[in-house]
Amino acid sequence: MISYLEFEKPVAELEQRIAELRNAAEGDDVDISTELQRLETKSAALLASTYEALTPWQKTQVARHPSRPHFHDYIEHAFDEFVPLGGDRCYGDDEAILGGFAKLDGRKVVVIGHEKGNDTASRIRHNFGMGKPEGYRKAIRLMELAGRFGLPVVTLVDTSGAFPGVEAEERGQAEAIARSTEACLALPVPMVAAIVGEGGSGGAVALASAERVLMMEHAVYSVISPEGCASILWRTAEKAPDAAEAMKVTAQDLASLGVIDRIVPEPVGGAHRDPRLAVSTLGTAIAEELDKLGRYAPHELKRLREERFLTLAG
């Protein structure tokens, strides 16, 4: 069953009418095909027009949709032969950040990403995708393995931000994020990062400092959440829609600013409407980018990353 967002109410009402009409016609000889087709056409057009005109705040809500595909969905349907690797060899294993060896379109890769979970139990287990220091140190370990074995790195970013708890700070959260970012920039192998949902602050940048950065059409990427920004600037989270607009959080804005390289289209109505199609589309896009990067030597890949981020800073 689809979980509707607030701005999708008109679509929800139409789809409910369609469902009621189908149920009422079951077992009857009444021909409702014409009316059903009319309503379905109207619903599809309304859904398309709604998603063509989403505001940055509405896109933020779509990026956070609970049914949106997560790391495990991409691993299951876009990658093959996944072998998970756990632990940072220092403190423990963080289930908010997962990774391991896999194959993408026949190519061996190391894949790393945030996992938010899809129900109450799994969300708690994965800490809602908020990585801890041991998670980022695990990512560093996997990136070092990728460099040692000459395997491309793929990262799937979906986090509201790194975990801000006291225990994480005590274990060196800031240092772990900085070291993970440094590891990305120093990789001697191709790296493609994809923002698949939320890309929140340093917790996202630590896995997205790649030479090619992709974003799903309705994903968001920002230095702080709209609510957090609004609370600082206006002392109220109710100004979150204004903050989202001002921060340029959408894939479309970030592509125009040169922060990301490619927007990956989503099914009409968002990735949560057709997760399998969304996953397949992104998998194809990542494989294409890896093909392009395969011709570069290690020193050229590092130079590409340096130029990318120096250009943004300048």
Language-model regions: role of each:
Residues 157-287:
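Conserved catalytic cores of soluble enzyme domains
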Residues 32-35, 135-136, 229:
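Short, motif-level signal for alpha-helix interfacial/capping segments enriched in acidic residues
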Residues 61, 101-103, 108-112, 154-156, ...:
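Structured core elements
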Residues 14, 55, 111, 158, ...:
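Terminal peptide-recognition signature
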Residues 60-63, 124-128, 269-272:
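Short hinge/gating elements
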Residues 91-93, 99, 104-156, 163, ...:
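Glycine-rich beta-alpha loop segments
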Residues 1-108, 276-314:
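Intrinsically disordered, low-complexity segments enriched in small/flexible residues
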